[in-house]
Amino acid sequence: MQNYQSHSIKVLKGLEGVRKRPGMYIGDTNVGGLHHMVYEVVDNAVDESMAGFCDTINITLTEEGSCIVEDNGRGIPVDIHPTEKIPACTVVLTILHAGGKFDNDTYKVSGGLHGVGVSVVNALSKRLIMTIKKEGQIYRQEFEKGIPISELEIIGKTKSAKESGTTIEFFPDESVMEVVEFQAGILQKRFKEMAYLNDGLKISFKEEKTQLQETYFYKDGLKQFVKDSAKKELLTPIIAFKSMDEETRTSIEVALAYADDYNENTLSFVNNIKTSEGGTHEAGFKMGLSKAILQYIDNNIKTKESRPISEDIKEGLIAVVSLKMSEPLFEGQTKSKLGSSYARALVSKLVYDKIHQFLEENPNEAKIIANKALLAAKAREASKKARELTRKKDNLSVGTLPGKLADCQSKDPLESEIFLVEGDSAGGSAKQGRDRVFQAILPLKGKILNVEKSHLSKILKSEEIKNMITAFGCGIQESFDIERLRYHKIIIMTDADVDGSHIQTLLMTFFYRYLRPLIEQGHVFIAQAPLYKYKKGKTEIYLKDSVALDHFLIEHGINSVDIEGIGKNDLMNLLKVARHYRYTLLELEKRYNLLEVLRFLIETKDALSLDMKVLEKSILEKLEGLNYQILRSFATEESLHLHAQTPKGLVEFNLDDNLFKDVLFEEAHYTYQKLMEYNLDFLENKDILAFLEEVENYAKKGANIQRYKGLGEMNPNDLWETTMHKENRSLIKLKIEDLEKTDAVFSLCMGDEVEPRRAFIQAHAKDVKQLDV
């Protein structure tokens, strides 16, 4: 075993500024920074694994709000540091830039200067507990806000002399961090990634609050990574290979396959850090791959079609490239792009040699890959011809713009905005209602093409898409230039119904797949047209949704109610809680039937703790009191099933754990408890929901409430005042928070594969709270 003692810890001082400027060290003090703290501690353990001294990492999110990271590595050194004269582990936890990562003999490869990380985590934690198992002893030390509050002390002996490792438990400091609640979903993705990239490393993750427990372990990690990343059927087997360059101490590992897909999905990593912007290693990979495949096509396939180029080779490619190197050079602070020049040549040569060998030894698979590239080249040429029809001249004259476009007078992109409007009738209202100086209108006829299911050559033949590209002025694909964008706000404006939502989704898919920089730079918005218009006498109010309508009715209805024993503000707040309670009950009724039984279960104290037979008796008495006819009833220890004839017809009711664990049931129960915090004596035993309805009816009396199905129902002035006027309107800016997750959702929901989409809908249908049919 490599000797890992205090002299391996190199020190660069200065922890004072971390709490003052945490963003400089962890990116931000929000969700991203919080989880970065976890990664820094876990990365230390993974570095031990890459050095060959650790094969198990356990991460636990505790109910108390802490994160525990435990590894079975060598354990941080506990002997006295030669220059600091305190235990080396204390140095690592309290001095910035102290760590074995600065010593090439200790860690041949590392994700970076992780000695920075663990001390920063300590500085940003209100409490941190370090436990070390080393040389038969168990050591422990506690810190608060980066400062030791105890000496390093021996608290026991290990079960065996060989047992070793480090455990760090930290509680994020809410006085520095804006967010201190960890999100399991974010962490799961990263830990799974780490397990893929490190064969034989077992990462166990547990969240005590939800009892979530998962273990990630892969023997052929990169091959599994490629398999799991495939959104469509693989056309080839997964090709995997690895190599070690002794001169530069660089390990290269690659896995790739081709799928029946138009999109490329290449992921690259350096020392387990995702290089989302690529770099020299990714460039070398694509260079070697293209060279091998193009050479094979030139030597083995005679064709009169266009010769493929590198871009064609990437169509349908799924690949993972992982490098582990001793001194990576990254471009920028984020380490998202590798700059080490020698990596390009190393990776390119390895990939060329291995792919060349594979193609020679596997003629059937070679033919599949070659034909896919040839088809991509053919489609590219067709796309090029179609693109010429949509390509914008240097200075767009009015004559070249789409005929349906009602352009604005301003030529300043910063103040100009374009509305993509569903249908000609709504387009007509929008054209009449707009501010012609800076607002342009482009009506879209029907539903645009689903670009997820179509090749670019077909996409660019779509009249609606051609009109959009021409109007925007920024081009598409290789001709894309965001500097030529004619409008800095592109606003999707559709009806507030199912078709409108579908058109929004189709447009978002198009922007995401082919004009993603417009989303990334904040140019794409969705207009929030009102769903309701309330008119009473000369009063006209527009309300964006049913929640806004209900709140409006409550606020105006209580003015007509003469109530003693509660103030108007308290009454208003109470009724808004009651309104939410009613909403959750009605949603539950859609799933389980018998609203009266649901209310009984929620509102009867200790009902959920009753024996099922006792519960059955109480429920039957309740229903019989309502003159419902019980046709069948059957109870076991864990469930109750009954059929009843009600005024609404024959209904079935099932009572079991599915109901009790339903998120909506829990929400309804919680909301009812909130209601009970109010003094309800003023109701004089009147039902709170009946009273809510009474208040709403006062506001509805003599009023006309119109629900808009389409923008075309609104006159130009209404549309201007509610949806287009800068002072009044509400816009949603499109953002991409997680590129991979977004990509997966678009592929799943908009792609060709029916079964995965059906499974997704079935899994999430119960979580839909509003469904417009």
UniProtKB/Swiss-Prot annotation:
Mg(2+) 1 binds at residues 422, 495. It catalyses: ATP-dependent breakage, passage and rejoining of double-stranded DNA. GO terms for biological process: DNA topological change; DNA-templated DNA replication. Its EC number is 5.6.2.2. GO terms for cellular component: chromosome; cytoplasm. GO terms for molecular function: ATP binding; DNA binding; DNA topoisomerase type II (double strand cut, ATP-hydrolyzing) activity; metal ion binding. The record marks 447, 450 as: Interaction with DNA. It is found in: Cytoplasm. Mg(2+) 2 binds at residues 495, 497. Its cofactor is Mg(2+); Mn(2+); Ca(2+). A type II topoisomerase that negatively supercoils closed circular double-stranded (ds) DNA in an ATP-dependent manner to modulate DNA topology and maintain chromosomes in an underwound state. Negative supercoiling favors strand separation, and DNA replication, transcription, recombination and repair, all of which involve strand separation. Also able to catalyze the interconversion of other topological isomers of dsDNA rings, including catenanes and knotted rings. Type II topoisomerases break and join 2 DNA strands simultaneously in an ATP-dependent manner. Few gyrases are as efficient as E.coli at forming negative supercoils. Not all organisms have 2 type II topoisomerases; in organisms with a single type II topoisomerase this enzyme also has to decatenate newly replicated chromosomes. Belongs to the type II topoisomerase GyrB family. This is DNA gyrase subunit B. It comes from Helicobacter pylori (strain J99 / ATCC 700824). The gene is gyrB.
